């Protein structure tokens, strides 16, 4: 089935998101597109996933919880304590039901863009990292270096960003989703393997 028109999605996001979130969304979408070209991923899928990754971000926590309960979307302990984390899960649901996305890889990229998951697909890695390095981000440690490495060795950049994320959460005594920790731990194992994702030469 044909995926939804990107122009329509962009107009919908401009309407649904606040200005700051919309600018971030554009940054993620275009960064994802750049990484997709670098690593040979599908360009349109990267743009759609990037454009929709935060489509539920501006919903209230109450609304996100309501959607999860109404449509039997599971809520884990970390999400119960921090309902804002539900925006990825709800966003993936809305991408399918409201915006007409049918590609499972796009839906998974939206679903896992906050926590990551072990054995992410190329598109999932691209969207996760694009959310971290897009031009509007300013304060993450070693950000210029991670941005540079992202276009040379995707897995290495992913590890660096995951390390920073876990360090930030631990330093602030904040809840760490078990999936993020698993993603980091397994990525450390896989990074030494010959399947590391490097730019197309």
Where are these regions (language model features)?
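Divalent metal-dependent catalytic cores for phosphoryl transfer on phosphate-bearing substrates
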Residues: 10-16, 38-160
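Acidic/histidine-enriched, glycine/proline-rich intrinsically disordered or flexible terminal extensions
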Residues: 178-188
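Long, amphipathic alpha-helical surface segments
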Residues: 156-172
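Conserved small/polar residues in nucleotide/adenosyl-binding loops
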Residues: 189-195
């Amino acid at each position: 089935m044909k995926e939804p028109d990107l122009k329509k999605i962009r107009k919908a996001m401009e309407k649904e998101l606040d200005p700051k979130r919309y600018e971030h969304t554009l940054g993620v979408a275009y960064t994802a597109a750049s990484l997709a070209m670098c690593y040979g991923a599908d360009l349109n899928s990267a743009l759609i996933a990037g454009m929709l990754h935060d489509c539920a971000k501006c919903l209230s926590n109450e609304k996100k919880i309501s959607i999860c309960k109404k449509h039997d979307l599971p809520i884990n302990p970390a999400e119960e304590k921090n309902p804002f984390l539900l925006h990825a899960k709800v966003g993936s649901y809305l991408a399918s039901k409201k915006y007409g996305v049918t590609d499972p890889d796009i839906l998974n990229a939206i679903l896992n863009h906050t926590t990551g998951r072990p054995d992410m697909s190329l598109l999932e890695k691209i969207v996760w990292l694009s959310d971290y390095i897009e031009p509007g981000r300013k304060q993450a440690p070693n950000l210029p270096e991670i941005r540079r490495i992202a276009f040379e060795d995707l897995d290495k950049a992913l590890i660096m960003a995951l390390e920073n994320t876990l360090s930030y959460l631990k330093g602030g005594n904040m809840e760490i989703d078990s999936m993020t920790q698993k993603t980091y731990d397994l990525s450390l194992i896989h990074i030494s393997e010959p399947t590391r994702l490097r730019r197309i030469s």
